Amino acid sequence: MFIPLVDLLRCVRAHDETWLVASIDEAADRDIVRGTLGCPICLTEYPIIDGIVLFDDAVPPVLTVQAAPREDDAIRLAAALDLTDARMTALLHGAWGAYAPILRGLTPAQLLLVNPPQGIASGDGVSIVRSGRVAPVAHNAVAAVALDAGAEPPMVESLVASLKPGARMLGQARTPIPEGLAELARDAEVWVAQLDAGTASSSPVTLTRRSR
């Protein structure tokens, strides 16, 4: 878990949103390898094991990637979410987390993975959390979200709430666009939408069909 990203994480218990306090037992460069995040309101503690923050015992089963991610698909994902700035944090939900190792070579943005597939390691610009019903992320915290298909409503709501004004979300074409987002582009496989933000500007989106 990248230490600066701890500021974006929030307790998942039912109380006012609050930051978490990090207790570090082992670190490598700027990543927490082993430690604890504690809530100052309810005193819940969340362990960090192998760089992964565990927020809930009722975490969905770890996904297994059926096919190796393709570099051209990762390029397409980075372009659709406009991951061009090192100050950005992009959240990859579920199966989209499989693209993180490739994306690290394509974008300077920090990557926060929520419930990624098995075998994805934390570190080197990739941070991982595992949580049950909701994403443990502050409101207005991230610049982009890739939404996995089949997410339950509480998870979708928390992911939308995590978007900054004008931020982008990408989802599979069969997944409905969440309320409050305006569609920017769509093809047979994915859509890209933006959180409504008045006059917030956005660079153009080009979706090209994946090569077979």
Mark where each language-model region is.
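N-terminal auxiliary segments of SAM/dcSAM-dependent transferases
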Residues: 1-68, 72, 179-180, 201-212
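Short, polar loop motifs at secondary-structure junctions
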Residues: 94-99, 112-121, 173-176
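A short, well-structured beta->alpha microelement
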Residues: 72-76, 112-136
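A short glycine-rich, Lys/Arg-flanked "PGG" loop and its adjoining helix->strand segment in the class I
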Residues: 153-169, 174-175
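A short helix->loop->beta-strand "cap" motif at the edges of active sites that frequently abuts
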Residues: 107-111, 164-167
